UniProtKB/Swiss-Prot annotation:
The lineage of its organism: Bacteria, Pseudomonadati, Pseudomonadota, Gammaproteobacteria, Enterobacterales. It comes from the Bacteria. Keywords: Plasmid. The gene is yubE. It comes from Escherichia coli (strain K12). This is Uncharacterized protein YubE.
Amino acid sequence: MNYAGHKKLRADVAEVANTMCDLRARLNDMEHRCRFDSDVLVERLARQTLYRANRLFMEAYTEILELDACFKD
């Protein structure tokens, strides 16, 4: 264990990582339900926005996963 005295921080980081995992799954689901070649403008815009947001979110999620991996039990 390399986080003596920082158990709350460890728990908080793990909670954030888990929450981000759930959100990532939700974003993926929404992104795949919308079509980039839809005849409906709203659906095309939603797909484009979700795609970009998902890509940016993945960068932040990767950072949190790397931080989470730093804690050794």
